[in-house]
């Protein structure tokens, strides 16, 4: 038996979608919103940039629960939809006067604002969207009640708790904060009580999930910031990222270039001498002078091993140079998006050997990242790592990339930490000095997590962070241990041809002296005999 044909053809379905789109546009244009409501409407819930989604899709795709319209129709999340409806029935039974139809009617005046918060077009009709908001906001509030500082009963158990936590912190899995406030206000019948409870659960959630240890000091300032937040992920972002304006760094760059030019004159002078030596040794007369005695010596008994070692040293540098050129070409061929700019900053281990000491700051804000050049102390906010941290970090970076037009402060901070953490030894040192608190299985897992964050939507510079990086580099390169090590690396290990030539000349002189002594002693014995 042939399957039944669909009621609407593809053309009719396409025409139906267009009709619904026109209706939504007319409804949006005809809606009467007050002036302050229009100012508050901002796009704040975005799709993850493809560059980031391709690098680690598991961190951006919900696995257990959908919040909002973007992922609610996915079959793998339907099981949790039934659970959300069960929680909704319990909420209805708990509050005698609570009816979801009344909540949907309360949210109806906010439909235009709700749609305006989403960057992607929402294909649901108004009633469907409002019911999604009512059910999801009620579930989310019940789930977050366990983080309240007050003793509030919750209807949700902790089964799959961490999975749900990761899902509700994803950028595509957000609902506007004003919807949560309206739902709580409807339940508690008090705007002030709703704000107090919502602020309480959000601060508790941020303390548990934040990658930086946050301390909330002033309640009044916190309430003022809370009023301006767009959703849960935005609230966490505002708590750990300072608000700064885009700075003009041209003058600072010129000063830094002047300082670098003055400080590197001696090194450039030595490089020029080395370059001239290479030009002399690369000439044909010098090549003949060098190779002729070397061929004689290499054919003597016992010198074959020395010849093989020298040939290896000569050819290895050429092979490394060829490999470096090939790698540079391959890097240029990498397609967009760009890799995160590798910071020119030593690792924690190298800095520790050079005398740098890492100190945790009292507040978890990124603005506390500083370096004291006099004492060699590197101040960093305390980093909190657990099984949820990677997802939170990646979604904060994605949210900043889509929502911020100025400097990407949090992205630059993650690049800084990625630059100083290269191995498990770096993680161990940070942990022992109180800068990092890890609940992962091992230090190696923590290092791999940071090093895995290698994609960025766009490169950026942040004034106070870049100044800190420059101060650290200046302090590190100014240490005598580092200077001597670099000189040995550049002018000893990097000059095998010159060293091999000097060794060959010295060996030739010793062999000649030995032959002369042998011939002269034989001549004396001959005359004496």
Swiss-Prot record:
Disulfide bonds: none annotated. It is found in: Membrane. The chain crosses the membrane at residues 498-518. It comes from the Eukaryota. Its main location: membrane. GO terms for cellular component: membrane. It holds the Pfam family DUF247. Glycans are attached at residues 365, 403. Keywords: Glycoprotein, Membrane, Transmembrane, Transmembrane helix. It is a single-pass membrane protein. Belongs to the UPF0481 family. This is Putative UPF0481 protein At3g02645.
């Amino acid at each position: 038996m042939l399957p039944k044909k669909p009621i609407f053809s593809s053309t009719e379905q396409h025409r139906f979608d267009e009709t619904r789109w026109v209706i939504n546009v007319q409804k949006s244009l005809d809606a009467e919103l007050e002036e302050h409501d229009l100012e508050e409407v901002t796009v704040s819930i975005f799709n993850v940039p493809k560059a980031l989604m391709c690098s680690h899709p598991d961190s951006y795709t919900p696995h257990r629960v959908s919040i909002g319209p973007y992922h609610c129709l996915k079959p793998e999340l339907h099981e949790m939809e039934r659970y959300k409806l069960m929680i909704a029935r319990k909420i209805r039974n708990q509050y005698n006067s609570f009816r979801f139809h009344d909540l949907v009617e309360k949210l109806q005046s906010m439909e235009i604002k709700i749609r305006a918060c989403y960057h992607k077009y929402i294909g649901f009709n108004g009633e469907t969207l409002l019911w999604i908001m009512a059910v999801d906001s009620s579930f989310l509030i019940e789930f977050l009640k366990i983080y309240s500082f007050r003793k509030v009963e919750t209807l949700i158990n902790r089964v799959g708790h961490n999975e749900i936590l990761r899902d509700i912190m994803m950028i595509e899995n957000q609902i506007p904060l004003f919807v949560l406030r309206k739902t709580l206000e409807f339940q508690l019948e008090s705007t002030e009580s709703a704000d107090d409870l919502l602020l309480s659960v959000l601060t508790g959630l941020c303390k548990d999930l934040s990658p930086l240890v946050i301390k909330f000091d002033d309640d009044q300032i916190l309430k003022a910031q809370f009023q301006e937040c767009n959703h849960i992920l935005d609230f966490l972002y505002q708590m750990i990222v300072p608000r700064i304006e885009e700075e003009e760094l041209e003058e600072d760059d010129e000063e830094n270039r002047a300082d670098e030019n003055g400080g590197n004159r001696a090194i450039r002078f030595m490089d020029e001498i080395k370059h001239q030596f290479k030009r002399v040794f690369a000439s044909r007369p010098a090549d003949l002078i060098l190779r002729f005695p070397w061929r004689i010596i290499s054919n003597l008994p016992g010198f074959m091993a020395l010849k093989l070692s020298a040939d290896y040293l000569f050819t290895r540098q050429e092979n490394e140079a060829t490999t470096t050129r090939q790698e540079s070409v391959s890097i240029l061929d990498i397609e967009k998006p760009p890799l995160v700019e590798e910071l020119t900053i030593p690792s924690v281990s190298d800095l520790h050997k050079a005398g740098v000491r890492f100190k945790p700051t009292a507040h978890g804000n990124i603005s506390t990242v500083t370096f004291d050049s006099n004492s060699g102390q590197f101040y960093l906010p305390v980093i909190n790592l657990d099984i949820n941290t990677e997802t939170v970090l990646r979604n904060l970076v994605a949210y900043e990339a889509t929502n911020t037009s100025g400097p990407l402060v949090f992205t630059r901070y993650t690049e800084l930490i990625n630059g100083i953490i290269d191995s498990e030894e770096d993680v161990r040192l940070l942990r022992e000095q109180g800068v990092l608190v890890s609940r992962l299985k091992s230090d190696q897992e923590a290092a791999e997590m940071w090093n895995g964050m290698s994609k960025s939507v766009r490169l950026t510079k942040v004034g106070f962070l870049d100044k800190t990086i420059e101060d650290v580099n200046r302090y590190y390169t100014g240490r005598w241990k580092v200077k001597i090590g670099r000189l040995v690396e550049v002018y000893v290990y990097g000059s095998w041809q010159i060293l091999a030539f000097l060794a060959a000349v010295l060996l030739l002189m010793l062999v000649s002296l030995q032959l002369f002594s042998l011939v002269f002693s034989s001549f004396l014995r001959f005359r004496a005999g």
